[in-house]
Structure formats: structure tokens, C-alpha cells
Amino acid sequence: MQLNSTEISELIKQRIAQFNVVSEAHNEGTIVSVSDGIIRVHGLADVMQGEMISLPGNRYAIALNLERDSVGAVVMGPYADLAEGMKVKCTGRILEVPVGRGLLGRVVNTLGAPIDGKGALDHDGFSAVEAIAPGVIERQSVDEPVQTGYKSVDAMIPIGRGQRELIIGDRQTGKTALAIDAIINQRDSGIKCVYVAIGQKASTISNVVRKLEEHGALENTIVVVATASESAALQYLAPYAGCAMGEYFRDRGEDALIIYDDLSKQAVAYRQISLLLRRPPGREAYPGDVFYLHSRLLERASRVNADYVEAFTKGEVKGKTGSLTALPIIETQAGDVSAFVPTNVISITDGQIFLESNLFNAGIRPAVNPGISVSRVGGAAQTKIMKKLSGGIRTALAQYRELAAFSQFASDLDDATRKQLSHGQKVTELLKQKQYAPMSVAQQSLVLFAAERGYLEDVDLSKVGSFEAALLAYADREHGELLQQIDQTGAYNDEIEGKFKGILDTFKATQSW
């Protein structure tokens, strides 16, 4: 075989022309220590605060401490097989989670991966877990209500769209029950819901998901889960991931509701991470920035104006405001609301619903203490009918508590005092409500009207519950159109007042309970 030099040179030229060199510059570092989910890395000179660091085995860590000679990072997931000397790389990316309508009805972990066995997620893109809250100019005042379906909350501690209302109380006082019922009540309101479970047992979360499914509310809800068995890093980041998913709807001119259950466990997870990173401890061993931990999260819940929505959607959505309403939950120890984390969150939020174990154990459920529960901005969002009828309830309860304390020492009470005590007891009984039984605005209004106008005076205390159930069944059967009209408009006028009087007079004259 004879080789032609011309052919060889042509072949070499062709190969040289086709030769393509792709060079990638990686900022690479070396793990120098691994302990309790924290790694220290040497050599990552260009790493950003909060950047994802690529680890062997398709895992990531997040850079939290940038020091002179090393980087302290928290591992997202299992870390038992990581060892000193392993190579890691910068990614140049901040942690992002999938967002979109495809997440509704799904259960996901902190990183947005589905854990409900229903297949891959259908998402609309990714969003950074850490985002700057809307500015002052981009916001709009709260003037539309979020109905929880609880008489005691909607009447005395109303919540508006875009508000942050803290639910605070000891363990086993009905905090999660109140939040779950608020989600169930949004089935037909158009409000999308996000439930973030932090540091809870997997069995508890499974029960919550099942209840949401049973009541037809799961298809409207995203459940974000960081169980007690997961790393502190995932528990710390879960609320931010859930918030990013909720902001997707807010920024597109829709309304969303997010529940953080609960932020006490998130603060404990953050304290654990901070101590392992050797940050100096402060009060109750929490780091100095634990206030900022919660403020930067809760400030993202807001009502944004139409200009913000139009600018965000590049003109696709016009004339619509968006909102993200937050119901953070805080667990107290022995009713101590003056502890570090509870006082922080109380000062950040727009009011609090305080649930008391004494009331809960006495059978008053929801165990709301109306004396120290408050809504700072929700009053402006109340429907006209609720605002008109709820004023007397708070006053009646305040007078009842004062007289009840006084009557323990006074043996002889006059008729007016006895009447007030009896009225207060009946109002307290009337505000009791079973779990998973939220009430519409019209139903609540009719019941409050009956209490305020003295229709309970001749009803025995033990019969108040059956009186209410019979009244609502009668009104629904005979005056369904009126109730629907009130639910749609929330209006209150002389005509509606007259109709309510007619309903109650006829009911008391013709029905038994």
C-alpha cells in the first residue's frame, strides 16, 4: 500500500479544522472538615454568600460563612459519606425552587422535589428562595378580607389579604387546626394556599394532607414538607421555599395564603446551624440575626398594587392587585409570650391570635383569648355586615370577663349584672365551633345578629349549640337566596336587617331545637 503525501496533508488539515477545544474554568475547593452537616472548604476564592456548592454524588451545600481561609457551608441532604480531601466546585447559582400552577395539589420537599408519588412536577420555571420584599411604593393598603370560617376570628380578629397574622399558643391548643380550617375555607374563594410543615412528624403531615384531600382543598394547595428527621438546613430553608411558591401567584395579580407551621422550629434549626458554624450566640443561644431571619420572610407577605403586577408580567395582566397573606405559627412554653422568638414575631406581624390552653381544656374551641388577640389592619378589610354585627360581641365578652372575675367575690348580684353574665356565657358558647366545619359570612352574620339582638335570652345555655344548628338549617332551607346574596356582596342595610328579624322571629315561633 502506497501513501500519497498530498492525501495525508489534506487529511491532517481537515482534522485540524474540525478540532474544537472547549475550556471550562471551575473554581474548585477541597473539603477540610465535615461535622454534623457542616463542611469547611478551602480554596473557593470566588464563592458568593448563599451560593450552591456542588458536592460529589449530585448533592449541594449552601455557603453561609465566608471566612479568610475557608468557607463554612451547610449540606442539603445526607453527609455521612463526605470525607476530608474531596473536591467541590462553585456553581455560580443561588438556590432556586420550581414554581407554577402545576404544583397545586402536590406535596414537595424544601428543594421542590415531589414526595407524593404522583410523578414529575409540571412547573412554569424556577424562582430564588431568597427574594427582596416589595417596596413601600409597590404596596397597596389591605382592604379585602380572608375569611377563615371561624366566627371568633372573622368577627373579632379579622384578617385581610396581604396581612401577616400570627397564630400563637402552647402545644395542643388548636393552632394547626385553625390554619387547616382557614385553608379548607378557601376552596371556593379563588385564594391559592401554601402549607409549609417545618420539623413535624411525617405521620402528622400525612394526616393533614389526607384531611385537605377529604375536604376538597388539596387541589388548591401546595404542601411543602421538611420533617423532623430531615437536616436542620432543609428545615431552615423550607419557609423561604414555600414563600417563593406563593409569590408566583401574588406577582401575577392573584391572591395566595401561606401557613408556616411553625416558625419556632425553624428558629431552632437556624440556631443549630449557627452554633455549628461557630457564630457567637446571643439570648437563649440564638444568633444575633434571628430577628432578620423572620422579618425578611414575613415582609414578603404583602398586597401589591396594579402597577407592580403590570410591570412584573410585562403588561400581560392589567388592573389587578396581588396579595400574599401569611399566617405564621409560633409555639410558646407555658403561655410565655414574652420569650425571645415570640416577641420578635409579634413585633413583625400585623396582629396575633392567642390560643390559651386553659380555654382549650375548658372545651372552648377555638381557644381564642379575645383580650390579648388583635388584628392591626384587618378591620379595614372586614365586610360591611361583619363590621356592623361584630362590634357588640367583643364588648360583651370584655364585660363578661370583667364581671366573671368580680362575681367570684360578690355574693349578691343585681339583675343587670346577672343578665350580662348570662349573655356573656351564651356568647362564649355561641363562638364554639367544631373542627373542619368553617362557616360562610352569611351564616356567621345571622348567628351574630341573634346574639346581639337578644334572641338568646330565653335559650338555655346547654341548648345554645342546638339552637344555632337548627337556625342555620332553617335559614338555609327557607332563605337560601338571601344567604347567597350576603355571601356575594357582604352588604348590610335596613332591608337585610328586617329580613334577619323576620327569619329569627319565625324560627323561634315555629321551630324546636
UniProtKB/Swiss-Prot annotation:
Keywords of this entry: ATP synthesis, ATP-binding, Cell inner membrane, Cell membrane, CF(1), Hydrogen ion transport, Ion transport, Membrane, Nucleotide-binding, Translocase, Transport
Record has Cell wall biogenesis/degradation as a keyword: no
EC number: 7.1.2.2
Subcellular location: Cell inner membrane
CDD domains in the cross-refs: ATP-synt_F1_alpha_C, ATP-synt_F1_alpha_N, F1-ATPase_alpha_CD
GO molecular function: ADP binding; ATP binding; proton-transporting ATP synthase activity, rotational mechanism
Membrane topology: Peripheral membrane protein
Reactions this protein catalyses: ATP + H2O + 4 H(+)(in) = ADP + phosphate + 5 H(+)(out)
Domain of life where this protein originates: Bacteria
Binding positions for ATP per the UniProt entry: G169, D170, R171, Q172, T173, G174, K175, T176
Residues flagged as site, Required for activity: S373
UniProt similarity note: Belongs to the ATPase alpha/beta chains family.
Subunit structure: F-type ATPases have 2 components, CF(1) - the catalytic core - and CF(0) - the membrane proton channel. CF(1) has five subunits: alpha(3), beta(3), gamma(1), delta(1), epsilon(1). CF(0) has three main subunits: a(1), b(2) and c(9-12). The alpha and beta chains form an alternating ring which encloses part of the gamma chain. CF(1) is attached to CF(0) by a central stalk formed by the gamma and epsilon chains, while a peripheral stalk is formed by the delta and b chains.
Known function: Produces ATP from ADP in the presence of a proton gradient across the membrane. The alpha chain is a regulatory subunit.
Name recorded for this polypeptide: ATP synthase subunit alpha
Top-level taxonomy: Bacteria, Pseudomonadati, Pseudomonadota, Gammaproteobacteria, Enterobacterales
